[in-house]
Amino acid sequence: MAKRSLASLNAGDLSGKRVLVRVDFNVPLNDAGAITDDTRIRAALPTINDLIGKGAKVILSAHFGRPKGQVNDAMRLTPVAARLSELLGKPVAKTDSCIGPDAEAKVGAMADGDVVLLENVRFFAEEEKNEAGFAEKLAGLAEVYVNDAFGAAHRAHASTEGVTKFLKPAVAGFLMEKELQYLQGAVDEPKRPLAAIVGGSKVSSKIGVLEALIDKCDKVLIGGGMIFTFYKARGLSVGKSLVEEDKLELAKELEAKAKAKGVELLLPTDVVLADNFAPDANSQVADVTAIPDGWMGLDIGPDAVKVFQAALADCQTVIWNGPMGVFEFEKFATGTNAIATTLAELSAKGCCTIIGGGDSVAAVEKAGLAEKMSHISTGGGASLELLEGKVLPGVAALNDAA
């Protein structure tokens, strides 16, 4: 069921109203406490600017890091408020706490179009416990609720789920709406052929996604460290490569399931090997049937890249989650970069390309190709759970579209 969106509320509905907006401002900081990547802050601007334009009083709620329910000065949102103020070109007041006298006073002093950022909501243990009394206090600051934090939508926390019991309407912000439109659309009503590229080091972290995607896709391409568990399950020698011994049977089952469903499941035909796990390791390319002892696979090989490119050539929708190799090491980033380039080229031809959160987003940004993709998801765990077909509590709690 589609969710009600912020687009359904006009200036008449919002002017002078206090609107609580849950945003995802969990940005990386360097040792000096400066923001190194403001993508998540910029991603929330369309929603914030829309509310300012409609004369709302914009109260932002966010978490940062994992303070474990206690005040931690290193995890205050002060640098975020400063950066947001620069991006909006107007002052952003920050409260000392997300509830209590200071928050109430600053919200009470707001004029229409003002923006207040509540302090880190995870300074209270009640947030992650979704405690009703805490949710009611948070909701008490506002009259309308907007959830634009897709990256936290898979959590049933007070600021993502609990507050909706006390605030109506509860609607999706523009970022949340876009995420649902692309990710749910890709799974529920994709333009076919639909391919998924799944990478990363462990099968265990992607089991649910692989099972769900084999159900829905025409082609599933697997890369990253997890390929060696599949090879070992086939009886191949994998040298020192990463293998999850307890997942060998599962790898066999996934291959059998794909075969039974007529889904093309592709594993790399060759790999780039290293003699140790280091950026300057000695390397060689080997066929997957001839991996020598003492070597470990850190990237997909040049032949595998060609096979993957050929498989993707006719696809109309491609979902990518997880790198093809250890892309942090330049020597072993070739496979990942090649896939990023291929998807950028497919996008230009009208294919819908979706980068499903996590390391693949970092890889696409590192390759300078982020702008070329149809959609880059801001959620890691939330993207995976949505692709698995799970219900996200933060989404389920919003009002349904009329």
From Swiss-Prot:
Major enzyme class: transferase
Subcellular location: Cytoplasm
Alphabetized PROSITE patterns for the sequence: PGLYCERATE_KINASE
GO cellular component: cytosol
Pathway entry: Carbohydrate degradation; glycolysis; pyruvate from D-glyceraldehyde 3-phosphate: step 2/5
Residue positions binding ATP: K206, G297, E328, G357, G358, D359, S360
CDD domains reported in the protein's UniProt record: Phosphoglycerate_kinase
Residues annotated to bind substrate: D24, F25, N26, R40, H63, F64, G65, R66, R122, R155
InterPro entries on file: Phosphoglycerate_kinase, Phosphoglycerate_kinase_CS, Phosphoglycerate_kinase_N, Phosphoglycerate_kinase_sf
Domain of life of the organism encoding this protein: Bacteria
Catalysed reaction, written as an equation: (2R)-3-phosphoglycerate + ATP = (2R)-3-phospho-glyceroyl phosphate + ADP
Keyword set, alphabetical order: ATP-binding, Cytoplasm, Glycolysis, Kinase, Nucleotide-binding, Transferase
Chain ranges passing through the membrane: none
HAMAP family tied to this protein: Phosphoglyc_kinase
Family: Belongs to the phosphoglycerate kinase family.
Description of how the protein assembles with itself and partners: Monomer.
Protein's name according to its UniProt entry: Phosphoglycerate kinase
Species in which this protein is naturally found: Synechococcus sp. (strain WH7803)
Gene: pgk
